[in-house]
């Protein structure tokens, strides 16, 4: 939709990967719609995943005992976080939709993306106490997880060896994104591209493009336990 701004946080080492293709077709389709698309290519950026005292540029509030959450909160209020964090926060703040594109690692995100979440979505910027879940500071924004798996779709069902995929989305979609206020759209899951045929991979890409054509009309999922653990 013309005028909309999208941040695509991309976490894969190889541009020629299937994740790279998913990222590229998303950029192309959203740009065709008139959206302004910004990509944070975390590996290319050599993004620092570790949350350390180096994230604070000024004096610590307690130099004797370092507590990252408290120090990041105080530093955010004083605009004393490092420039890489502030830049990513600026991108998030400007975005109407944030898409995370990544391969599933151990039922979660790659370490570099986990580090992005740890460092960027800090207290004061993304949430406060009170000021989380439906009252989170990013409540006017949409978020979507688009990821690939190593296994087939059948493996991520209730009867499958990995269980229903919604189980492992609970901490990511609910405990992270919804906690910060995001309205979470249904995930885009590309099951087993490495074990799929070229034709099947083309279908996955086409399905993603087709979905993006009407992405602004989608309703968020109900971020309640019933979505993840019932049905």
From Swiss-Prot:
Transmembrane segments: none annotated. It comes from the Eukaryota. It is an enzyme of class 1 (oxidoreductase). It holds the Pfam family Flavodoxin_2. Its cofactor is Zn(2+); FAD. Zn(2+) binds at residues 174, 178, 223. Binds 1 zinc ion per subunit. Its EC number is 1.10.5.1. Keywords: Cytoplasm, FAD, Flavoprotein, Metal-binding, Oxidoreductase, Phosphoprotein, Zinc. The modification Phosphoserine is found at residue 197. Gene3D superfamilies: 3.40.50.360. FAD binds at residues 12, 18-21, 104-107, 148-151, 156, 194, 201. GO terms for molecular function: chloride ion binding; dihydronicotinamide riboside quinone reductase activity; electron transfer activity; FAD binding; melatonin binding; NAD(P)H dehydrogenase (quinone) activity; oxidoreductase activity; oxidoreductase activity, acting on other nitrogenous compounds as donors. It catalyses: 1-(beta-D-ribofuranosyl)-1,4-dihydronicotinamide + a quinone + H(+) = beta-nicotinamide D-riboside + a quinol. GO terms for cellular component: cytosol. It is found in: Cytoplasm. Belongs to the NAD(P)H dehydrogenase (quinone) family. Homodimer. Uses dihydronicotinamide riboside (NRH) rather than NAD(P)H as an electron donor. The enzyme apparently serves as a quinone reductase in connection with conjugation reactions of hydroquinones involved in detoxification pathways as well as in biosynthetic processes such as the vitamin K-dependent gamma-carboxylation of glutamate residues in prothrombin synthesis. This is Ribosyldihydronicotinamide dehydrogenase [quinone]. The lineage of its organism: Eukaryota, Metazoa, Chordata, Craniata, Vertebrata.
